[in-house]
Amino acid sequence: MQLYRFIVIGKVQGVFYRKSVSQNAMKAGYRGTVKNLNDGTVEVYAELLDDEISGFLELLKEGSPASVVHDISYVSANSERLEYDGFVIL
């Protein structure tokens, strides 16, 4: 497992995006966190295997019914493991 940091750009705040991502990620068995940033984007940390990245990106693109995702960037995060179980909204 590797920890990845995702930044989601678009209409992703005030539209239940974090709640939808958290619920769908937990259903799929992912561990991570999702958090609003001051610049209007959403930051997501997730522990994934390399072959899970494309499926997780689809989950992030889906978001909530009212959200509109314009772009998602991601990098490998330099951290050992998450401190949380499940998928936590911060």
Show where each model-derived region lies.
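Intrinsically disordered, low-complexity, mixed-charge
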Residues: 1-90
